[in-house]
Structure formats: C-alpha cells, structure tokens
C-alpha cells in the first residue's frame, strides 16, 4: 500500500481591511485548510469566504482556534487556566461550525494556532483541555497535533482521533518542539530545503534538529504556513516531490485509515 500524507495550511487569517496569506492559490495544493476563527485572526466575512473556497475545492475544512490576541497574531503566550482554554476552543469551534454546515460540509479537524499550539505541545493539562473541547463539540473531528507531543497523548486519553503533524517550513529543537520564531533559522523559506525536510520526515521518519541531531518523527500531515511569503512555492514543490516519490497526498481521514489499517 502506498504511503499517504496530508498537506495542510493555515488560512482565513485576514480580517477587516487587513489582508494576509495566499489562500486561493494554496487551496489548489493542500488537502486540509485550518481556518482562523476570529480570535487571533479572521472575521465572519473572511470565515465564510474561506470555508466556501475550501469546500468548492473539496479541501477538508478545520477550525484553527487561537488565543484572543489580534495584535500579536496569537503568537504570544497567555497564562490561561485549562478551563479557560477549553472554553475558548469550544467558542471558536462554535463560531466556524455553522459556516461549514452552511456550505454543505462539516469540520473535519481542529488545529490550535500559534502560542496555544506550542504551549499545549508541552503542557498536558492544556492539551487535555483542547482535546475535551473537541470531544464536546465535534467528537468525530481529528485533532491535528505536533508529532510526539502532549497533545497526542491527551487526545488518546480523552478518546478522540488524532494525527501527528510535522512542519516543512520550521526548524526543530532536539526535543521535537519548534524553534521559536525569534531565533535565527527558525523559519525555512527555501523551497528546496523545505521539500527535502518533508521527504525526510515522510519517507524516513526522522528530522534533523537545529543542532544537527536526527530525531524520530511520525508524519501524518505536513504544514505549510499560509503567511509565509513563499507558501505557494513551498507547497507546490513539496506536493510535486511527494507524488514523484509515490506518496499519495490525501486528507486526514484517509491518512488515518491507512496508518491504522
């Protein structure tokens, strides 16, 4: 059976007069779209438009909840209790879900954004709060979680489906976490380098950390950040080379079926 992997991108991150990302172009390349829900980015007009575009391209629609931090784009840590995190995720899923249904689709997955994602990757209680929010609102949806993280453990404990995500356009620490964006070399915008890393993770099950050490990794889904100026080039190159290597690029549901069949 050929390998299968999902290709996802964060999108719907414009709001009001502010435009961000190349959503329309990316939707021709990705299989899953993580759509901002109004807290770190996005608004009701952008949410509807992005869901509509994704549904028309048969791209899986997912919620991308973040901290309530428009000014910081959800990339600044906030000290919230697990209960607060659970409820802010429920709130944002609830905001996006009707738009999906109005466009004839359903939320297929949930992926936390930015600082919320990174904090939950290493904090089990926050990770569990997110998993519980998914179970209470969209129990059939898949949690998209950093590979080998606390989110994967929490999802399994709570009893929801989970897929392990890797990043072609980000550098890794030795412990499998992402290098902070404030550090040199944290963001990768060279299509060749990003593609080589994606192939290494999918085909060889490993990634080279920023200190040169190889670490094992599980790659169910590859993320390309929509706000990366070279996102379209990266996604196009990655998809082309994956398919050349006989890897099927499909949405998360099919990746899970293949991984556990």
Swiss-Prot record:
Domain of life assignment: Bacteria
CDD domains reported in the protein's UniProt record: LamB_YcsF_like
Catalytic reaction(s) noted: 5-oxo-L-proline + ATP + 2 H2O = L-glutamate + ADP + phosphate + H(+)
Matching SUPFAM superfamilies: Glycoside hydrolase/deacetylase (SSF88713)
The protein's Enzyme Commission number: 3.5.2.9
Record-linked InterPro entries: Glyco_hydro/deAcase_b/a-brl (IPR011330), LamB/YcsF/PxpA-like (IPR005501)
Keywords: ATP-binding, Hydrolase, Nucleotide-binding
The keyword Hydrolase is assigned to this record: yes
GO molecular function, one term: ATP binding
One Gene Ontology biological process: carbohydrate metabolic process
Subunit (UniProt): Forms a complex composed of PxpA, PxpB and PxpC.
HAMAP family recorded: PxpA
Function in brief: Catalyzes the cleavage of 5-oxoproline to form L-glutamate coupled to the hydrolysis of ATP to ADP and inorganic phosphate.
PANTHER family: 5-OXOPROLINASE SUBUNIT A, UNCHARACTERIZED PROTEIN YBGL-RELATED
Family per similarity comment: Belongs to the LamB/PxpA family.
The protein's name: 5-oxoprolinase subunit A
Organism: Coprothermobacter proteolyticus (strain ATCC 35245 / DSM 5265 / OCM 4 / BT)
Encoding gene per record: pxpA
